[in-house]
Swiss-Prot record:
Name this polypeptide is given: Uridine kinase
An example Gene Ontology CC term for this record: cytoplasm
HAMAP family in alphabetical order: Uridine_kinase
Entry-linked Gene3D superfamilies: P-loop containing nucleotide triphosphate hydrolases
Species assigned in the record: Sodalis glossinidius (strain morsitans)
Family membership noted in the UniProt record: Belongs to the uridine kinase family.
Keyword Glycoprotein among UniProt keywords: no
Amino acid sequence: MTDKPHQCVIIGIAGASASGKSLIASTLYRELCYQVGDEHIGIISEGSYYKDQSGMTMTERVKTNYDHPSAMDHSLLFQYIQMLKAGLPIEMPVYSYVEHTRRPETLHLRPKKVIILEEILLLTDLRLRQEMNLSIFVDTPLDICLMRRMKRDVNERGRSMDSVIGEYQRTVRPMFLQFIEPSKQYADIIVPRGGKNRIAIDILKAKISQFFE
């Protein structure tokens, strides 16, 4: 954890795909909004910063390894974090997991006291780590992550079960072992058992609440 001015506090939450990190992030966001007001806290998904692939065919898009750091536009995310810290609003990209590229619209986000970042590859990027006041890794067994991912991608993203399993074998698991799991060493706090670990959520909420004092 680095000592940063508290004008804009950055909380990073990483972990395997379907580990429960998004649930933890959304729970913290919802409960802290109730506590301090939504004008003081925001949330950003690294998944919004997949690179724009509008110039590629759908066949080319589906071949992208979305679990590799090169699929992410971390430079844009880093730039936007710096803008928020400078008191400037940003226009967040909106990514379509069905079309595998960015949508034309953006989401307006004003600077907040606390910004929660969440997604799989956040801790693999040194620039992003250096901007974080608190870094968290959600540590969930891979077999549980796979079951959750299958349910999510089939029901919410229009994927077939065969394609989800194939992608898991080709890229998700290998990239987790190569990039995501090693990034756990950079976390200030490791949360076991995913998004339903209520004790961990309460501890994190108490820690983040200190930044509002």
